[in-house]
From Swiss-Prot:
GO terms for cellular component: cytosol. It comes from Pseudoalteromonas atlantica (strain T6c / ATCC BAA-1087). It comes from the Bacteria. PANTHER family: PEROXIDE STRESS RESISTANCE PROTEIN YAAA (PTHR30283:SF4), PEROXIDE STRESS RESPONSE PROTEIN YAAA (PTHR30283). Belongs to the UPF0246 family. One of its GO terms (biological process) is response to hydroperoxide. This is UPF0246 protein Patl_3620. It holds the Pfam family H2O2_YaaD.
C-alpha cells in the first residue's frame, strides 16, 4: 500500500530533526529548472503569481535565491518534518519510531510543486510553489504541464517496489491532479472525512486535512496492507460509513466536536 499526501505552506526549519537518516530527492534536475525560472521573477511578480502579501513575496524571492544543491543535514531538512500544516499535525512524524520512519520511507510519498515527488526522509530546502501555480516554463503554462508524466512514473516505480497495486489518495485535488490515474499501475482508494455540522455531515477543510494526516499515521503505525483494514480507522472519533461509501471512496463520519 502506497499513500500520497500534499505538502504544506507552513514550514518548520527551526526544530531539530529526530529522523534516523536522510535521503536525496530524485527529481532535483527538474527542481533546478523551476528554481532558475523562478529567480527571474521580481518579488512583485511572485506576489501576483502566488496571490500572497509583499512580505511573503519577498521571503520567497529570498528562498529562490538561497536554494542550492547539494542538500545536506546542515542546509536542508527531511520533508516529513519540514512541512508543518494541518495534515502534518495529524501525522505527527516527530513522534515516529525508527521503524515508523522506515515504513513511511517505503510506503508514503509527498506531492510537491517544486520537488515533484518526495519520500518522507528526502532532504529539502525551504520554498513555496504550489502545484496550481501558473508558472510558465519551456514545458507549458503551468506546473501540471511542467511535470507531465514524471510524477506518475515515479509513483508506478514506488508501487512496484513496495509490493502491491493499492494507492491511497490522501492529497488535495490541487495536488492529485498532477497524477494521471489512467497511466497509474494501481487501484486508487480515496478516503473522505466528513464532520457533522448544522444538521448534516459535510467536509470541513481544517478537520479533513488533519484527518488525512491521522489516516496516514494509522497506515504507517499499523503497517496496513489490506484495504479492508482501512475501514477500522477510528482515530479522533471518526467511524467508517458503509452507507455513504461507494466503490473506491471510503467515507468516514464524525459527530460534532
Amino acid at each position: 500500500m502506497l499513500l500520497v499526501v500534499s505538502p504544506a505552506k507552513n514550514l518548520d526549519f527551526e526544530k531539530h530533526s529526530n529522523a534516523p537518516s536522510s535521503s536525496q530527492p530524485e527529481l532535483l534536475e527538474h527542481s533546478q529548472q523551476l528554481i532558475d525560472r523562478s529567480r527571474k521573477l521580481s518579488p512583485a511578480q511572485i506576489g501576483s503569481l502566488m496571490k500572497i502579501s509583499d512580505k511573503l513575496a519577498g521571503l520567497n524571492a529570498d528562498r529562490f535565491a538561497a536554494w542550492h544543491t547539494p542538500f545536506t543535514d546542515e542546509n536542508a531538512k527531511q520533508a516529513v518534518l519540514a512541512f508543518n500544516g494541518d495534515v502534518y499535525g495529524g501525522l505527527d512524524a516527530a513522534s515516529f519510531s525508527e521503524q515508523d520512519f522506515s515504513y513511511a520511507q517505503k510506503h508514503m510519498r509527498i506531492l510537491s510543486g517544486l520537488y515533484g515527488l518526495l519520500k518522507p526522509l528526502d532532504l529539502m530546502q525551504a520554498y513555496r510553489l504550489e502545484m496550481g501555480t501558473k508558472l510558465d516554463t519551456e514545458r507549458g503554462t503551468n506546473l501540471y504541464q511542467f511535470w507531465g508524466n514524471i510524477i506518475t512514473e515515479k509513483l508506478n516505480q514506488a508501487l512496484a517496489e513496495q509490493g502491491d497495486n493499492v494507492l491511497v489518495n490522501l492529497a488535495s485535488s490541487e495536488y492529485f491532479t498532477a497524477v494521471k490515474p489512467k497511466a497509474l499501475d494501481g487501484e486508487i482508494i480515496e478516503p473522505v472525512f466528513k464532520d457533522f455540522k448544522n444538521g448534516q455531515y459535510k467536509i470541513i477543510s481544517f478537520y479533513a486535512k488533519k484527518a488525512r494526516g491521522l489516516m496516514a499515521r494509522y497506515i504507517i503505525q499499523n503497517k496496513v496492507s489490506d484495504v479492508a483494514k482501512l475501514r477500522d480507522f477510528d482515530t479522533a472519533g471518526y467511524r467508517f460509513s458503509e452507507e455513504q461509501s461507494a466503490g473506491n471512496k471510503l467515507v468516514f463520519l464524525r459527530d460534532e466536536q
